[in-house]
Amino acid sequence: QNLCTRVSGEKLIIASVMQPYTDADGVISIEDPQINDKKLAVKDVYWQRDLYQPGYTLVCSYRMADHTQLEPVGHKALAGTAMKVYMSGKNVYVLCRTVAKRFDETERTGITKFVVDSEGTVKATATHIVKGIVGEGFAVKEQGGHLWLCMSVHHYKSEWKWKKAEVPFNWKLLAHYTGQLKMLCGEEESSRNVSVYALDDSLQEIGTSSEICKGETVQCARFLNKTLYLVVNDDRKMIQVSMAAEADPQVLAQIKLADEVHYLHLFPSDPSMIFSLGKTTTGELDMTVFWATEGSDIKQVASYGLRQHDSSALADHTKILVQKTEKGFYLGFATYNAEGLQYPLLHYTA
Protein backbone atom coordinates (compact mmCIF):
# COMPACT_ATOMS: atom_id res chain seq x y z
CA GLN A 1 0.00 0.00 0.00
CA ASN A 2 1.50 3.32 -1.12
CA LEU A 3 1.43 6.12 1.46
CA CYS A 4 3.30 8.89 -0.31
CA THR A 5 4.93 9.54 -3.70
CA ARG A 6 7.19 12.36 -4.86
CA VAL A 7 9.11 13.21 -8.04
CA SER A 8 12.50 14.85 -7.47
CA GLY A 9 14.40 15.61 -10.67
CA GLU A 10 14.68 12.31 -12.54
CA LYS A 11 13.95 10.27 -9.42
CA LEU A 12 10.68 8.86 -8.17
CA ILE A 13 10.49 8.39 -4.38
CA ILE A 14 7.82 6.06 -3.00
CA ALA A 15 6.95 5.25 0.62
CA SER A 16 4.74 2.19 1.13
CA VAL A 17 3.77 -0.23 3.88
CA MET A 18 3.68 -4.02 4.13
CA GLN A 19 1.06 -4.99 6.70
CA PRO A 20 0.46 -8.35 8.43
CA TYR A 21 -2.10 -10.67 6.87
CA THR A 22 -4.15 -13.64 8.09
CA ASP A 23 -3.93 -16.87 6.10
CA ALA A 24 -6.63 -19.51 5.60
CA ASP A 25 -5.70 -21.18 8.91
CA GLY A 26 -6.11 -17.95 10.85
CA VAL A 27 -2.36 -17.53 11.36
CA ILE A 28 -1.12 -13.94 11.29
CA SER A 29 2.00 -13.60 9.14
CA ILE A 30 4.31 -10.83 7.99
CA GLU A 31 6.31 -11.17 4.78
CA ASP A 32 9.93 -10.07 4.70
CA PRO A 33 10.40 -6.67 3.02
CA GLN A 34 11.18 -7.06 -0.67
CA ILE A 35 11.55 -5.09 -3.90
CA ASN A 36 10.58 -6.76 -7.19
CA ASP A 37 10.31 -10.13 -5.39
CA LYS A 38 13.86 -9.77 -4.02
CA LYS A 39 14.24 -9.64 -0.24
CA LEU A 40 16.11 -6.73 1.26
CA ALA A 41 19.44 -7.36 2.95
CA VAL A 42 19.54 -7.22 6.74
CA LYS A 43 21.65 -4.03 6.60
CA ASP A 44 18.82 -2.30 4.72
CA VAL A 45 16.22 -2.93 7.45
CA TYR A 46 16.10 -0.53 10.40
CA TRP A 47 14.52 -0.98 13.80
CA GLN A 48 13.02 1.75 15.95
CA ARG A 49 12.45 1.02 19.62
CA ASP A 50 8.95 0.72 21.10
CA LEU A 51 7.19 0.20 17.77
CA TYR A 52 3.47 -0.42 18.17
CA GLN A 53 2.18 -1.68 14.81
CA PRO A 54 3.85 -4.76 13.23
CA GLY A 55 4.77 -4.69 9.55
CA TYR A 56 7.31 -2.78 7.46
CA THR A 57 7.50 0.68 5.91
CA LEU A 58 9.57 0.85 2.71
CA VAL A 59 11.27 3.95 1.32
CA CYS A 60 12.41 3.38 -2.28
CA SER A 61 13.87 5.54 -5.03
CA TYR A 62 13.68 4.82 -8.75
CA ARG A 63 15.46 6.37 -11.71
CA MET A 64 13.03 7.37 -14.44
CA ALA A 65 15.11 6.41 -17.47
CA ASP A 66 12.14 7.00 -19.75
CA HIS A 67 8.37 7.09 -19.46
CA THR A 68 8.00 3.32 -19.72
CA GLN A 69 10.52 1.93 -17.22
CA LEU A 70 11.59 2.56 -13.64
CA GLU A 71 15.03 1.45 -12.47
CA PRO A 72 15.35 0.73 -8.70
CA VAL A 73 18.24 2.70 -7.21
CA GLY A 74 17.96 2.81 -3.42
CA HIS A 75 15.74 1.22 -0.82
CA LYS A 76 15.46 0.91 2.94
CA ALA A 77 12.84 -0.59 5.26
CA LEU A 78 11.74 0.35 8.76
CA ALA A 79 10.22 -2.32 11.00
CA GLY A 80 6.76 -1.01 11.83
CA THR A 81 3.73 0.30 9.94
CA ALA A 82 3.77 4.07 9.40
CA MET A 83 0.80 6.22 10.39
CA LYS A 84 2.01 9.12 8.27
CA VAL A 85 4.81 9.81 5.80
CA TYR A 86 5.96 13.35 5.03
CA MET A 87 8.29 14.14 2.12
CA SER A 88 10.14 17.39 1.57
CA GLY A 89 12.83 17.64 -1.09
CA LYS A 90 15.38 14.91 -0.41
CA ASN A 91 14.05 14.10 3.08
CA VAL A 92 11.45 11.48 3.98
CA TYR A 93 9.98 11.41 7.50
CA VAL A 94 8.26 8.20 8.63
CA LEU A 95 5.94 8.59 11.64
CA CYS A 96 5.01 5.43 13.57
CA ARG A 97 3.01 5.01 16.75
CA THR A 98 4.97 3.59 19.70
CA VAL A 99 3.88 1.25 22.48
CA ALA A 100 2.84 2.47 25.91
CA LYS A 101 5.37 2.36 28.71
CA ARG A 102 4.71 0.62 32.01
CA PHE A 103 2.07 2.57 33.97
CA ASP A 104 2.34 5.41 31.42
CA GLU A 105 0.07 5.10 28.39
CA THR A 106 0.72 8.59 27.01
CA GLU A 107 0.46 8.42 23.21
CA ARG A 108 3.83 8.78 21.47
CA THR A 109 5.07 8.95 17.90
CA GLY A 110 8.41 7.66 16.67
CA ILE A 111 9.95 9.68 13.82
CA THR A 112 12.61 8.26 11.50
CA LYS A 113 14.32 10.51 8.95
CA PHE A 114 15.52 9.09 5.62
CA VAL A 115 17.65 11.09 3.17
CA VAL A 116 17.64 10.38 -0.58
CA ASP A 117 20.80 11.82 -2.16
CA SER A 118 21.32 13.01 -5.73
CA GLU A 119 22.18 9.48 -6.88
CA GLY A 120 19.03 8.02 -5.35
CA THR A 121 20.75 6.30 -2.42
CA VAL A 122 18.48 6.06 0.64
CA LYS A 123 19.95 6.40 4.13
CA ALA A 124 18.38 6.62 7.60
CA THR A 125 20.03 9.53 9.41
CA ALA A 126 18.06 10.24 12.61
CA THR A 127 15.28 9.05 14.88
CA HIS A 128 13.34 10.58 17.75
CA ILE A 129 10.20 9.97 19.84
CA VAL A 130 7.77 12.74 20.80
CA LYS A 131 4.59 12.74 22.85
CA GLY A 132 1.37 12.88 20.84
CA ILE A 133 -0.24 11.75 17.60
CA VAL A 134 -0.36 13.58 14.27
CA GLY A 135 -3.93 13.67 13.00
CA GLU A 136 -3.29 14.71 9.40
CA GLY A 137 -0.44 15.28 6.97
CA PHE A 138 -0.74 19.07 7.04
CA ALA A 139 0.21 19.06 10.74
CA VAL A 140 3.82 18.33 9.68
CA LYS A 141 6.15 20.72 7.84
CA GLU A 142 9.86 21.04 7.10
CA GLN A 143 11.11 24.62 7.30
CA GLY A 144 14.76 25.46 6.68
CA GLY A 145 15.81 21.86 7.36
CA HIS A 146 13.89 21.78 10.64
CA LEU A 147 10.76 19.71 11.26
CA TRP A 148 7.64 21.26 12.78
CA LEU A 149 4.78 19.18 14.17
CA CYS A 150 1.37 19.93 15.69
CA MET A 151 0.32 17.00 17.91
CA SER A 152 -2.70 15.87 19.89
CA VAL A 153 -1.43 14.49 23.21
CA HIS A 154 -3.52 12.15 25.35
CA HIS A 155 -1.70 11.68 28.63
CA TYR A 156 -2.72 8.70 30.76
CA LYS A 157 -0.72 7.45 33.73
CA SER A 158 -1.50 4.94 36.47
CA GLU A 159 0.50 3.93 39.51
CA TRP A 160 0.17 1.98 42.73
CA LYS A 161 0.74 3.63 46.11
CA TRP A 162 0.57 2.50 49.73
CA LYS A 163 -2.06 4.50 51.58
CA LYS A 164 -3.29 4.60 55.16
CA ALA A 165 -6.15 2.15 55.59
CA GLU A 166 -9.31 2.66 57.60
CA VAL A 167 -9.60 -0.43 59.83
CA PRO A 168 -12.60 -1.68 61.87
CA PHE A 169 -12.56 -1.36 65.69
CA ASN A 170 -11.67 -4.99 66.37
CA TRP A 171 -8.51 -4.55 64.23
CA LYS A 172 -7.18 -1.70 66.34
CA LEU A 173 -5.22 -4.00 68.62
CA LEU A 174 -3.67 -5.75 65.62
CA ALA A 175 -2.72 -2.40 64.15
CA HIS A 176 -1.14 -1.38 67.47
CA TYR A 177 1.23 -4.38 67.48
CA THR A 178 1.92 -4.69 63.74
CA GLY A 179 2.22 -1.01 62.87
CA GLN A 180 -0.05 1.18 60.81
CA LEU A 181 -2.18 -0.86 58.43
CA LYS A 182 -1.85 0.26 54.80
CA MET A 183 -3.55 -0.63 51.53
CA LEU A 184 -2.11 -0.78 48.02
CA CYS A 185 -4.27 1.61 45.98
CA GLY A 186 -4.27 2.47 42.30
CA GLU A 187 -4.23 6.08 41.12
CA GLU A 188 -4.96 7.33 37.61
CA GLU A 189 -4.09 10.59 35.89
CA SER A 190 -5.53 11.58 32.52
CA SER A 191 -5.35 14.77 30.46
CA ARG A 192 -5.32 16.07 26.88
CA ASN A 193 -3.51 18.96 25.27
CA VAL A 194 -2.14 20.28 21.98
CA SER A 195 1.65 20.38 21.65
CA VAL A 196 3.83 22.00 18.98
CA TYR A 197 7.37 20.74 18.35
CA ALA A 198 10.35 22.15 16.46
CA LEU A 199 13.10 19.59 15.71
CA ASP A 200 16.49 20.26 14.12
CA ASP A 201 18.02 18.33 11.20
CA SER A 202 19.07 15.59 13.65
CA LEU A 203 15.51 15.43 15.06
CA GLN A 204 16.62 16.88 18.38
CA GLU A 205 14.12 19.20 20.05
CA ILE A 206 14.80 22.90 19.55
CA GLY A 207 11.61 23.93 21.27
CA THR A 208 8.20 22.69 22.29
CA SER A 209 5.02 24.14 23.72
CA SER A 210 2.42 22.05 25.52
CA GLU A 211 0.46 25.13 26.61
CA ILE A 212 -1.15 25.85 23.23
CA CYS A 213 -4.52 24.46 24.25
CA LYS A 214 -5.20 22.32 27.32
CA GLY A 215 -8.01 19.77 27.36
CA GLU A 216 -8.23 19.73 23.54
CA THR A 217 -7.29 17.69 20.47
CA VAL A 218 -6.45 18.93 16.97
CA GLN A 219 -9.19 18.74 14.35
CA CYS A 220 -7.11 20.19 11.51
CA ALA A 221 -3.91 22.22 11.17
CA ARG A 222 -1.91 24.07 8.51
CA PHE A 223 1.54 25.66 8.44
CA LEU A 224 2.19 28.66 6.19
CA ASN A 225 5.60 30.33 6.21
CA LYS A 226 6.34 30.73 9.95
CA THR A 227 2.74 30.59 11.14
CA LEU A 228 0.57 27.68 12.25
CA TYR A 229 -3.23 27.74 12.09
CA LEU A 230 -5.07 25.00 13.96
CA VAL A 231 -8.65 24.16 14.88
CA VAL A 232 -9.46 22.31 18.12
CA ASN A 233 -12.42 19.98 18.64
CA ASP A 234 -14.33 20.68 21.84
CA ASP A 235 -14.04 24.44 22.21
CA ARG A 236 -14.46 25.04 18.46
CA LYS A 237 -11.88 27.72 17.92
CA MET A 238 -9.13 28.57 15.44
CA ILE A 239 -5.73 29.44 16.89
CA GLN A 240 -2.83 31.28 15.24
CA VAL A 241 0.64 30.27 16.48
CA SER A 242 3.92 31.97 15.58
CA MET A 243 6.88 29.68 14.81
CA ALA A 244 9.27 32.60 14.27
CA ALA A 245 11.04 31.74 17.53
CA GLU A 246 11.28 27.95 17.25
CA ALA A 247 12.44 27.56 20.82
CA ASP A 248 9.22 29.11 22.10
CA PRO A 249 6.12 28.89 19.85
CA GLN A 250 3.63 31.60 20.82
CA VAL A 251 -0.15 31.96 20.42
CA LEU A 252 -0.84 35.21 18.55
CA ALA A 253 -4.60 35.20 18.03
CA GLN A 254 -7.70 33.02 18.16
CA ILE A 255 -11.34 33.12 17.13
CA LYS A 256 -14.40 31.23 18.35
CA LEU A 257 -16.09 29.17 15.62
CA ALA A 258 -19.84 28.71 15.30
CA ASP A 259 -19.61 25.45 13.33
CA GLU A 260 -17.42 22.37 13.05
CA VAL A 261 -14.35 22.73 10.83
CA HIS A 262 -12.83 19.68 9.14
CA TYR A 263 -10.50 21.29 6.60
CA LEU A 264 -8.42 24.48 6.41
CA HIS A 265 -6.99 25.95 3.21
CA LEU A 266 -4.29 28.64 3.07
CA PHE A 267 -2.95 30.47 0.01
CA PRO A 268 0.85 31.05 -0.20
CA SER A 269 0.20 33.89 -2.69
CA ASP A 270 -2.26 35.54 -0.26
CA PRO A 271 -1.41 34.58 3.35
CA SER A 272 -4.19 36.73 4.79
CA MET A 273 -6.98 34.65 3.20
CA ILE A 274 -8.17 31.38 4.77
CA PHE A 275 -11.21 29.28 4.05
CA SER A 276 -12.60 26.28 5.89
CA LEU A 277 -14.97 23.41 5.14
CA GLY A 278 -17.12 21.93 7.87
CA LYS A 279 -20.65 21.33 9.08
CA THR A 280 -23.27 23.53 10.70
CA THR A 281 -25.12 22.56 13.87
CA THR A 282 -27.98 21.32 11.64
CA GLY A 283 -25.65 18.98 9.74
CA GLU A 284 -25.34 20.96 6.51
CA LEU A 285 -22.03 21.60 4.79
CA ASP A 286 -20.54 25.02 5.45
CA MET A 287 -17.78 27.07 3.78
CA THR A 288 -16.36 29.98 5.79
CA VAL A 289 -13.83 32.65 4.77
CA PHE A 290 -11.45 34.31 7.26
CA TRP A 291 -8.94 37.15 7.08
CA ALA A 292 -5.81 36.99 9.21
CA THR A 293 -2.38 38.58 9.37
CA GLU A 294 0.37 37.52 11.73
CA GLY A 295 -0.10 39.02 15.16
CA SER A 296 -3.56 40.44 14.52
CA ASP A 297 -7.06 39.16 15.20
CA ILE A 298 -8.59 36.51 12.95
CA LYS A 299 -11.83 37.79 11.42
CA GLN A 300 -14.66 35.85 9.83
CA VAL A 301 -15.76 37.73 6.71
CA ALA A 302 -18.21 35.32 5.04
CA SER A 303 -20.03 32.04 5.64
CA TYR A 304 -22.08 29.99 3.20
CA GLY A 305 -24.34 27.09 4.13
CA LEU A 306 -24.95 24.43 1.48
CA ARG A 307 -27.99 22.20 1.12
CA GLN A 308 -25.74 19.15 0.90
CA HIS A 309 -25.10 17.14 4.05
CA ASP A 310 -21.97 15.11 3.33
CA SER A 311 -18.77 15.18 1.31
CA SER A 312 -15.69 12.99 1.04
CA ALA A 313 -13.73 16.26 0.97
CA LEU A 314 -14.21 16.61 4.74
CA ALA A 315 -11.87 13.66 5.30
CA ASP A 316 -9.76 13.64 2.11
CA HIS A 317 -8.20 16.87 0.85
CA THR A 318 -7.43 15.29 -2.54
CA LYS A 319 -11.16 15.49 -3.28
CA ILE A 320 -11.03 19.32 -3.22
CA LEU A 321 -10.31 21.50 -6.26
CA VAL A 322 -9.18 25.08 -5.52
CA GLN A 323 -8.19 27.76 -8.02
CA LYS A 324 -6.97 31.13 -6.74
CA THR A 325 -8.11 34.28 -8.52
CA GLU A 326 -6.92 37.87 -8.14
CA LYS A 327 -9.46 38.72 -5.43
CA GLY A 328 -10.84 35.34 -4.40
CA PHE A 329 -10.97 31.71 -5.41
CA TYR A 330 -13.00 28.94 -7.04
CA LEU A 331 -13.85 25.88 -4.94
CA GLY A 332 -15.21 22.57 -6.19
CA PHE A 333 -15.83 19.22 -4.47
CA ALA A 334 -18.22 16.26 -4.53
CA THR A 335 -21.24 16.31 -2.19
CA TYR A 336 -24.11 14.01 -1.28
CA ASN A 337 -27.75 14.63 -0.37
CA ALA A 338 -31.20 13.19 -1.05
CA GLU A 339 -30.79 14.05 -4.72
CA GLY A 340 -27.62 11.98 -5.00
CA LEU A 341 -24.05 12.88 -5.95
CA GLN A 342 -23.47 16.51 -6.95
CA TYR A 343 -20.49 18.69 -7.83
CA PRO A 344 -21.09 22.29 -6.72
CA LEU A 345 -18.66 24.97 -7.86
CA LEU A 346 -18.34 27.99 -5.56
CA HIS A 347 -16.79 31.33 -6.47
CA TYR A 348 -15.77 33.73 -3.72
CA THR A 349 -14.74 37.32 -4.43
CA ALA A 350 -13.50 39.62 -1.68
Where in the sequence are the language-model features?
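Beta-sheet-rich non-transmembrane sensory/scaffold domains
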Residues: 1-350
